[in-house]
């Protein structure tokens, strides 16, 4: 959309893709796809490794239910009705293909999207990449608890790649 808008005007720009929770997952999902040349880097804050991992965690923690057979059945139904299954929606697989810089941010006390997920994502992503885990931050509160430091970290990261 942005390409169609800017191209006729002759506008050249550089952009980052940035997202928090579901936006973070979306940001990582697109990171492994072919992208317009104006996308220069990514910033994700508290994104999950995959829909499978996140749904499995929620089934167990919120409802005390095992992932088998519910996850398998739900994934199969999703595939039959929507054309995709839970294993396909994987931020982890997409960041493996990402060649652009990415800043990973995650609260160290996040128990909704567990902090272990950011370490798997960070390890899977080829360089260039940076990781900042935020002490005392739970889910999606890193900015709220550390506005100045958060802004500075994002600014320092993006200034390396966007001019």
Tell where the protein language model's regions lie, with residue ranges.
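Acidic catalytic loop of the alpha/beta-hydrolase fold
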Residues: 108-113, 140-141
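Alpha/beta-hydrolase fold nucleophile elbow
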Residues: 9-21
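Catalytic histidine neighborhood in serine/cysteine hydrolases
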Residues: 122-140, 153
